[in-house]
Amino acid sequence: MKMNRHFTVPQNGESSTIQWTKRNSKITNPDGSKVFEANDILVPEDWSQVAVDILAQKYFRRKGVPKYLKKVQEDGIPEWLQKSIPDTEKLESLKPEDRFGGETSALEVFHRLAGCWTYWGYKYKYFSDEESAKIFYDEIVYMLATQMAAPNSPQWFNTGLNWAYGIDGKSQGHYYVDPSTGKLVKSTSAYEHPQPHACFIQSVDDDLVNEGGIMDLWVREARLFKYGSGTGTNFSNLRGENEPLSGGGKSSGLMSFLKIGDRAAGAIKSGGTTRRAAKMVCLDVDHPDIENFIDWKVTEEKKVASLVTGSMLNNRHLNAIMSACYEMEGEDRFNPKKNSSLKKTIQDAKKVLIPDNYIKRVIDLARQGYKEILFEELTTDWQSDAYNTVSGQNSNNSIRLTNEFMAAVEQDQPWNLYFRTEKEKAKVEGRKAKPSQTLRARELWEKISYAAWASADPGTQYHTTINEWHTCPEDGPINASNPCSEYMFLDNTACNLASANLQKFVNLETLNFDVEGFRYLCKLWTIILEISVTMAQFPSKEIAELSYKFRTLGLGYANLGSVLMVLGIPYDSQQAMAITGAISSIMHMTAYATSAEMAKEQGPFVGYAKNQKHMLRVIRNHRRAAYNAPSGDYEGLTITPIGINPAFCPSYMLKAAQEDADLALSLGEKYGFRNAQVTVIAPTGTIGLVMDCDTTGIEPDFALVKFKKLAGGGYFKIINQSVPYGLKKLGYSPSEIEAIVNYCKGHATLNGAPVINTQALKEKGFTNEILEKVEASLPLAFDINFAFNKFNLGENFLTKNLGISKEIFDSPGFSLLEHLGFTKEDINKANDYVCGTMTIENAPFLKEKDYPVFDCANKCGKYGKRFLSYESHIRIMAAAQPFISGAISKTINLPEEAVIEDIKNAYFLSWKMMIKANALYRDGSKLSQPLNSVLELLNGIEIDDQEEIREATISKDPVQIAEKIVTKYISHRRKLPSRRAGYTQKAIVGGHKVYLRTGEYEDGQIGEIFIDMHKEGAAFRSLMNAFAISVSLGLQHGVPLEEYVDAFTFFKFEPNGIVSGNKHIKMSTSVIDYIFRELAITYLGRYDLGQVAPEDLRGDEIGSKRATAESNGQEKETLSSMTAVIEPTPKKEVETISYSQMISKEKPSSSPSGISLLEEVKLAKIKGYTGDSCSECGSFEMVRNGSCLKCMSCGSTTGCS
C-alpha cells in the first residue's frame, strides 16, 4: 500500500511539532508510602500527570533493557528498521548491575511499538516501498505522542520487546501461523511473536481432562491472563446437575466446574503485576442449570453478608464469654449456674445463634488458662477475605437470550430447559428434543432481573441479533464474548483492539469534526491491527489457526461524551444519536474499505470465500443504516436497526458516512475483505487515561468538575474542559461563561465570599501571613474546611493567636470555622463561592433548556439532581450498533432507587433497539460498595441493649475512669505489678508477622511493650527487643506515650505496606510506625492514625481499664470490652468513649484534611466516583468502566481494558 503523510512533515518526521520534557512519576498509598516512582522520564509536554504516571508505571518495560544495542542484519530490511539485540562487547565495559535497566522515555515506548509494527508490515509487503514504511512509522509515533489513538494494553506490555531490545524468554506453549507458509508452528520464544491480543473467546468441551475440555480450559485461560489478556467462554456444552453420564451415574453439574475456574482466575494477576484476571462466563437460557447460574452471585453476596456479620458477632460474644470466666475465683467461675456474668454472656451469645460447641470451646480454653481468642472480623470490602472466600467474584456473567425466549416473555409463554445430552442426541437423530424441565418464561425473566438488581449480574447477550449480523455463519454461530462484551465472534478466536480519541478531531475554533483526519487515522490503525494478526502468537493451536483464518480486528473510539458536550449537544438527544451513528459509520466503513484494499494486495481472509454472500449481506445492511433505509429494505434481520437520521445529522458528516459506506461495499464486492470483523467499542479503561480522555468508549462524562494531578504531587480542581466550549457553542458570552464556570468549580479565593471572607477573618484574629496560607491552599481544596486545619494554619497560630487549646483542635470532628462562631449555613454559602457547587444546575445566566447538554452519568455535586436515564444510554448504543462489527462495552448506570421493573425495561428496550449486549449497574447493588443513603440512614442509630452489652463485657469497677492525671517525668522508676494486665495484638506488616504485647499498671496506663518478629533473624529480633526495652523504661520513668507516638509514627523503612490482622490499621510505613499507631489508637484514642473508623467496628475494641485479680494463679483480663479509654496527657482528663459513640462518631483520617472515612466516601460520590477505594493506590477515585471499575488516579482496572 502507498502511504501519504497527513500529520507529519518529511524533514522532521514524527517529532516535528511535539515538545518533549522531563517529568517525575510517583504513585503513593494514602499513608504516603510509595507504590511506584520513576524520575527524569522523557514525555510529551502536553501530557497530564495521570497519563505520565500510567505510562511509566504500567507500560514502561522495567527490566531487561540493555544499555547498549546493536542491529541484526536481515536481508530485505532497511537498516533503520532492523531488529536490535544487546551489544555484549560494550556491555562488558559496565558493571553487571548497570548493564540492563528499564525504559525511561515515552519515545522509547513509541519507537518499540511503531517500529515493531512497521518491521512486520515491511517484511510481509504491506507497504509499496521503504518511503511508505517510513511515513507509516512517523505518523504512528506522532499519533501515539499526541494521544490521538492507543492500542490495547497487551500491545504496550509485549509488542516490540524482542524487536527493539532483543528481550526473549522461554516459550509458554503458544502457537502461530507462519505468514510465509500458512503452516501452524509452535513458538520457541516468548516475545519474538508477541501476544498483542486483548480479547479471546474460547470453547470448552464436555470433557474433564482431555485437550479442549474443562481442566484444559483453565490452563489456556492462565496462559492468557499471564500476558494481560481477557477471555470469555460459553459453558452451555457442559451437562447440568444430575444429568446422566455415559458411564453411569449423574453429573455434578455446570456450577461445580465454574467454581473451579473462578478460583483459578482469582489466583492470577493479569500481565503479572498489572491487573487481576478478567473473564466472561456465558450460558444459554435453555441450559438445565440456568436458575442456579442466574442466582450464583446473589447467593454468594448473601454468604459474604453472613460471613461478615457472623465473624463480628462471634468475636464480640466469644471474647465476652472468655472475659466472664475471670469475673470470680475458683472452679465455679466456669459454671454458668454459679457465675451469673458467664450465664448472661452465654444467653446473649445464644440469642444471636453463636454455635453451642464454640461456646463450650471458649470456656474450655479459659479453664486451660487462655485469656483471649483471636477471631478475625471480616469486612465487605471487595478485596477482603470474605469476598475471597466465596465464589463467582472473578468473572462477568451473561445469559444468551434468543428471540424465541424474548417472545415467550412478551406473551407469558412456557420455556423449556434441555439436558445437553438429549439436545445433542435429538440433533443427530433429526427430532425435537425432550425438555428436562419447563418454566414460565416470565418467572425466569423475573429471576434474571432481580439478580441484576441485587448483584449487577447477569448481563444479557441477545443471541439472535448477534448472529443475524454474523459475517461468517458457515463456520458456526457466535456463542460468547470477551469479558467486556465488545468482541463477539466464533469460538477460539482473538481480537486486538485500538481506540481513537475523538476529541482530537474537533476543531476548537470552528467546533467542526475533522473528517479527513479521522479517516486517515482509521485507515492507519486498521493496518496496524491487521499487521498485529500477522506477527501474533496465540495460547492454543485452535486460536492460532482460526484467528489467522478470520483476522478479526477491534478498532474503536473514546471520548464521544466529551465531543457531544463540546458541540453543545445533549447526550440524550436525536442529534447525539445521529452524530454517534455518523462517526461510527465513518470509522467502521473506512476500516472495511481499508480491509478491502489490503485484500487486493494480500488476498481476502481464508474463510471469506465460504462466507462471501453472508458477509456482503451484512455490509449492505451497514450501508442501508447509513442511508436510514426503511425496515423492509434490510436483509435477514428481525429487528430494524437505528439508522442515521438526516434531519439531525450535520450534512458534512452524513455525506462522509454515506460515501465511506459506498466505498466499503464497492471495494468489498470487487476484492473481498482481509478481515471478518473490523470494529468494536471497548471500555478504553487504562488506555483512555493514557490518552487523557475525559470519557471512555461511548460513555457520557461522570462529573463536570475534575481533580487534576499535579506533577509535584497533590491535585487541583478544574472544570471539565468540554463545559466552556459547550457554553461557547450555545452562544454564551465570555463573562457569562466565566460566571458559570466559577459557580461550578468555585472562585478559589475568599475575596468577595459571603460572610466568611478576608475582612471577617481579620476581625477573628487572622494575620495577613496566615490569610496568604489560606488563599494559597484554596485552589487545591475540595471543601473550605480543608483550608482551615492545624496542618495548614499551624498549631502556634491556633493556640497563641486564637487561644484554642490543643485538646480542642485535636478532637475528632473539630471545625475551626464553627468554633469561631460561623454557622453551618455561613460555611455552606462560603464553600459554594470558594470551592464551587460541582454542578451546573442553577448557575447564573444558564438557561434551563441548556441543562441537558451538561447532564452526566451521575448526579453532580451535593446539589445536583439531574443525571442521564438508562434509556438515554441504550439509545446512544442503538445509534452506534449498526456500524460496529462486534458490540459495545458500556455501563448502563441506574440510581440506587431504581426498582426491578426498571431492570426489566432496560433489558427489554435493549433487545427492541437491536443492541447485542447489555450490562446494568444499579448504584449499591454490590455489598462492597459504600452507599451514601445507607450511611445517612444508619448514622447515629445506637444499639438498644447497649447497657446490657456493657454489663456483660466491661468490668463494673469504675476506678479512675474520670480521674484527672498530670503526667510528669519521675526520676525513680515506677515499677509494674508482678502480675499485670495488657493485651496481645498479632498483625502482618508488609508480609511479616508482628506480635505486640503490652503491660499495664493497675490504673490501666501502659508501662511496657514487647515486640516479637520471630522469623526475622537474630540481629533484627534483638534490635527490636532492645528498642522495646528502651521504650518500656521511658514509660516507667514518666515519658508520655504521646511523645513516642509523635516521634515514631510515619517512621519509614522496610518491611512496610499493607497491614492485615488489625481492625483499625491497614497501611504502615514501617514496623515501628505500625506499633505506635496501634498504641496510640488503643491508649490515646488517636483514631486519626488508623485507616478504619471506630464506627465501622462492632464492639471489639480492646478495653484499656483492666482490673487485675488473683484467681488460681491467673490474672483477670478484659479482652474485648466496649469501652476505649484515652490515655491521659498533661492537664487532660481521661475520656471514655461508649460503644454507641464508636458507631456514630466520625474519626479524623490520617490525611492532612482530617476527614473521616465515611466523609471520604461521601465526598468521592459527590465528585462522581463510586465510593470504592483502589486496590493499587488506595485512592477513592474509582469510576465504572464497562462492567468493571477504573482508578482515575493510577489507571488500575478491575477488568481487562
From Swiss-Prot:
Stretches the record annotates as Disordered: 1100-1120
Cofactor(s) the record lists: adenosylcob(III)alamin
Compositional bias segments (type: Basic and acidic residues): 1100-1118
GO molecular function, one term: cobalamin binding
Cofactor note: 5'-deoxyadenosylcobalamine (coenzyme B12).
Keyword Ribonucleoprotein: no
Catalytic residue positions: N482, C484, E486
EC number, as in UniProt: 1.17.4.1
SUPFAM superfamilies: PFL-like glycyl radical enzymes, YebC-like
Binding site for substrate: S153, A198, C199, G230, N482, P483, C484, S485, E486, P683, T684, G685, T686, I687
InterPro entries: RdRp_reductase_class-2, RNR_2_N, RNR_lg_C, RNR_NrdJ/NrdZ, TSCPD_dom, YebC-like
Single biological process term from Gene Ontology: DNA biosynthetic process
Keyword terms: Cobalamin, Cobalt, Disulfide bond, DNA synthesis, Nucleotide-binding, Oxidoreductase
Disulphide connectivity of cysteines: C199-C495
Enzyme class: oxidoreductase
Catalytic activity annotation: a 2'-deoxyribonucleoside 5'-diphosphate + [thioredoxin]-disulfide + H2O = a ribonucleoside 5'-diphosphate + [thioredoxin]-dithiol
Family recorded in the similarity comment: Belongs to the ribonucleoside diphosphate reductase class-2 family.
Function: Catalyzes the reduction of ribonucleotides to deoxyribonucleotides. May function to provide a pool of deoxyribonucleotide precursors for DNA repair during oxygen limitation and/or for immediate growth after restoration of oxygen.
Protein name: Vitamin B12-dependent ribonucleotide reductase
Species name: Leptospira interrogans serogroup Icterohaemorrhagiae serovar copenhageni (strain Fiocruz L1-130)
Gene that encodes the chain: nrdJ
